[in-house]
Amino acid sequence: IYYTFDSFFCSPRMENGVLGNALEGVHVEEEEGEKTEEESLVENNDNVDEEAREELREQVYDAMGEKEESKKTEGMSLSKPETAKEQESEMEKGGREDMDISEPTEELPEKVALTPDQLTETSEEAEGAAAPEGLNEAEVTSGKSEQEAADAEKGKSVSGTDVQEEHKEQVEEKQGEVIVRIEKPTEASEEQPGTTLGKDNTAVEVEAEPVDATAKPVDVGGHEPKEQMATSGNEPGKAVLNQQLVGQDVPPVEESPMVTTEAAEVGSEVSEKSEQEATVVSNDGAVNGLSAAGDQASVDPQPSAERVTETKGGSELEEVRAELAPSQEAKLPIEESEGAGDGVETKVAQGVTEKSPEDKVKIAANEETQEREEQMKEGEETEGSEEEDKENDKAEEETPNDSVLENKSLPENEEEEIGNLELAWDMLDLAKIIFKRQETKEAQLYAAQAHLKLGEVSVESQNYIQAVEEFQACLSLQEQYLEAHDRLLAETHYQLGLAYGYNSQYDEAVAQFSKSIEVIEKRMAVLNEQMKEAEGSSTEYEKEIEELKELLPEIREKIEDAKESQRSGNVAELALKATLVGSSTSGFTPSGGGSSVSTIASRKPADGASSSNCVTDISHLVRKKRKPEEESPRKDDAKKAKQEPEVNGGSGDAVPSGNEVSENMEEAENQTESRAAMEGTVEAGATVESTAC
């Protein structure tokens, strides 16, 4: 497992260095020690024999058996775990982040579609084609096996998870950009420069010869392609790689023997595969990027591969970029092809500086969404302002007018007044209780004054019965402690007379006013006597006498008013009795009214009125009967005198007892007459209908 992850993370970075430098023409500087060591290993490939190759195959088979046992215990996937897939994709994304390539790419919409079955078939063909390669293949594998063993031992100290975390951070920062970065190998890649990984977790280590820093840029007119590794499975070199990717299931492998076939074929089949490559790419429209990346990983820069990259044609470069662009466009198809057992992801070798059209479309869509959001915000602001205006209008409509406020203020003032009266009542009642508890004359007189004020409050509250009670309580206390000619008694009698008058008790009111006058007269007599006795200082008595004399006319007027009210009350009683008598005698009105109406109804047909005009005549008759109600009773005195005998049945010549009584009787008669007129109109309508029929 350790070797699997180690080779897993190192191979994409090596591929970045090779393919990126080939496309851009820029070479990565590496230490001189590594160059010399790698060159020496390449030279030693000539001394490798067939026995070394067989030993390496046995080691691979042993590693595969160990992998199967570890799979059973750990429950991991034989082909490739999902976690390894995600790590690989993230590693490859991170490897292409900072790659600076100025040439634009052409987009190919078609996706990678090579299945594991096809890879298996091509791997079988590749085995047959790899047999005649002979010594060159053996030499390459033997040299690589030695270097790979040394590198594998060195790589044990390197943690694959650290590299994974590093690339994860890079992928998260620039996930949507199609940029490939040439990144110098980390410690893991420096220690294991030749380690590559097949798709099915097969660790393939080859000797990577560093590219010269002064290498020339790509020759556009060349015909020797490195693109041969990206063509379809019909080519032998690719079939060998597919066998390497699919045929081996165990990741912890130190060397893959099938890599040698590709390395040997690079020099011999350059021209043939360049032609086949152009045709296959043009026909398919989209090359299997996964297999292309796997081939590039397995055949890392050897001298022959370096020559291929330097002489690659411009048309083939465009095809490489074209096949790399779709892999960035659709991550999902690539991941599906990985799950099917295809080769290493193609994203490692992407040399793109400009954003793909999909990214441009996404950017345009983001701009459109931002513009829409801004428009929505502006619309919300305008709607908010409109809502505020509506709320302000509603508030203005809800604000009451001045007249309404005044009308509301009136009840409030009344409530305040009522509140003040209630407060005064409470305070006076409390004072009354306090003074009554004291038995002194002064306290009792204060209690009497409290009763007097409580009576006045009751009068203001129109509670006349309560006022009468309070005045009587005050009067009883004053009579005990005051003299008969005291002015306080006169005042109490006067207030009591007013209360009786307001309560329509005119007899009692007249009596109280009379007593008040008597008290005042007594006071005046006493003052005259005192004035005669005090001959020197009579001015004070004279002033008081004058004041009392001024009060007498007012009290007498109150007495007269009470008497008149009493008389009017009597007249009102008589009027009510008369109305009651009129209502009781209204039983005679239907006959009299019916006779008068019948005579009128009999006259109309005599005038030759047609039955069609009867309806209009009814309305005319009703109007005539309503006129006495609308006219004032004073103007109809003559009519009343004529109609009284008819309505009252000859008993309307009664002699009135007085002018007022006669007027009241006339009003009662007018009411009875109006009732009779209404009843007569109803009967007239009935008679007219009968005649019309």
Swiss-Prot record:
Tell me the Pfam families matching this sequence.
TPR_12 (PF13424)
Any one GO MF term held by the record is: histone chaperone activity
Gene Ontology terms: biological process: blastocyst development; CENP-A containing chromatin assembly; DNA replication-dependent chromatin assembly
Q: Where is the composition biased (Acidic residues)?
A: 29-53, 380-400
Q: Which InterPro entries match?
A: NASP-like, TPR-like_helical_dom_sf, TPR_rpt
Record-listed Phosphothreonine modification sites = T36, T83, T369, T382, T589
User: Where are the N6-acetyllysine modifications?
Assistant: K156, K199
Basic and acidic residues: bias regions: 54-74, 82-99, 145-156, 164-187, 307-322, 627-645
The residue stretches assigned to a coiled coil in this entry are 510-565
Q: Bias regions of kind Low complexity — which residues?
A: 128-139
What tissue specificity does the UniProt entry give?
Answer: Testis- and sperm-specific.
Q: Which subcellular locations apply to this protein?
A: Cytoplasm; Nucleus
Q: Where is this region: Disordered?
A: 25-415, 583-693
CC annotations in GO: cytoplasm; nucleoplasm; nucleus
**Residue span of motif Nuclear localization signal:** 622-628
| Location of the region described as Histone-binding in the Swiss-Prot/TrEMBL record | 29-40, 124-157, 374-418
Please verify whether the record's keywords include Repeat.
Answer: yes
Keywords linked to the UniProt accession = Acetylation, Coiled coil, Cytoplasm, Isopeptide bond, Nucleus, Phosphoprotein, Repeat, TPR repeat, Ubl conjugation
Q: Where is this cross-link: Glycyl lysine isopeptide (Lys-Gly) (interchain with G-Cter in SUMO1)?
A: K642
User: Spans of the TPR repeats?
Assistant: 448-481, 490-523
Does Cytoplasm count among this protein's keywords? Answer: yes
Q: Which residues carry this modification: Phosphoserine?
A: 40, 89, 102, 157, 232, 304, 315, 327, 356, 385, 403, 409, 568, 611-612, 632, 651, 657, 662
Q: Self-association or partners: how does it assemble?
A: Binds to linker H1 histones. Interacts with histones H2A, H2B, H3 and H4. Interacts with histone H3.3. Interacts with histones H3 and H4; NASP is a histone chaperone that stabilizes and maintains a soluble pool of histone H3-H4 dimers. Interacts with ASF1A and ASF1B; the interaction is probably indirect and mediated by H3-H4. Also binds to HSP90 in the cytoplasm. This interaction stimulates binding of NASP to H1-6/H1T.
Its biological purpose is as follows: Component of the histone chaperone network. Binds and stabilizes histone H3-H4 not bound to chromatin to maintain a soluble reservoir and modulate degradation by chaperone-mediated autophagy. Required for DNA replication, normal cell cycle progression and cell proliferation. Forms a cytoplasmic complex with HSP90 and H1 linker histones and stimulates HSP90 ATPase activity. NASP and H1 histone are subsequently released from the complex and translocate to the nucleus where the histone is released for binding to DNA.
Similarity section: Belongs to the NASP family.
* Protein name from the UniProt record: Nuclear autoantigenic sperm protein
From which organism does this entry originate?
Oryctolagus cuniculus (Rabbit)
Taxon lineage: Eukaryota, Metazoa, Chordata, Craniata, Vertebrata
